[in-house]
A protein has these predicted regions:
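Short beta-strand
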Residues: 66-68, 102-109, 144-148
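Anionic group-transfer/hydrolysis microenvironments
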Residues: 82
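Helical (often loop-to-helix) elements that flank the catalytic cores of nucleotide-handling enzymes
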Residues: 88-97, 117-144, 173-189
Length: 211
């Protein structure tokens, strides 16, 4: 598989919408990158999704994916830490020392998107609950969790919430992942690490996290 195909599989989600982010090269007072987030409702074919990822990895257009799918299930989730003064390397090492099956990626603004990956889909409500427990255990109990929704009312136009994906620009990305020692990973290294730490639904159910 190509790199774009691997990312499309790793971050499988809703096929009825996607997001884009266009930066305006300004920074808000809180440190968050300023720009325009747009959610686009569209039925995505395999080729559509592949093109979105190719454009993302090449640095042409950033893509956002909705974690919760049409069946209200997820194969990945994220803890979104919108704090821009934290030491991401230290946090990545802390997560590793707690032996949590997570990988930390630098967000577009310099915060943290902390991901968990699964071998197969689980109910969004279950994943959200577990991620809230984990977030509290690492000291971020009040942050946003993706999936944000546990059920989508698709017939009413509900399309969930997108999360901007890592590795915009591929090898040259500022949205890279950190390994257990706090070193930056290449896209391929990240995908290999995500495979190493992915959980089965049963392993997720049994996962316990404490400070």
């Amino acid at each position: 598989m190509s790199l774009a195909e691997k990312f499309a599989v790793r971050y499988a989600g809703l096929r009825q919408a996607y997001g884009t982010f266009t930066a305006n090269n300004e920074t808000r007072e809180d440190g968050k990158a300023s720009g325009k987030n747009i959610t686009i409702s569209k039925e995505l074919s395999d080729s559509d999704l592949l093109k979105l990822w190719e454009d993302h990895l090449s640095g042409h257009q950033s893509v956002g994916i909705v974690a919760i799918d049409e069946h209200n299930k997820c194969v990945w989730g994220a803890i979104d830490v919108d704090e821009y003064q934290i030491d991401l390397k230290d946090l990545a090492v802390k997560i590793a020392k707690q032996e949590l099956p997570l990988v930390l990626c630098r967000s577009k603004s310099g915060g943290a998107h902390i991901y968990i990956f699964l071998t197969e889909s689980v109910p969004a409500a279950m994943l959200q609950r577990k991620l809230r427990q984990i977030a509290a255990a690492i000291g971020y109990g009040q942050v946003e969790i993706f999936p944000k929704q546990t059920k989508l009312l698709l017939d009413r136009g509900d399309r969930g919430s997108t999360l901007n994906m890592p590795y915009f620009g591929g090898e040259n990305s500022t949205r890279y992942a950190y390994d257990k020692k706090g070193a930056a990973m290449t896209p391929e290294e990240f995908l290999n690490y995500a495979k190493e730490i992915e959980l089965t639904p049963n392993e997720l159910e049994k996962l316990e996290a404490s400070p």
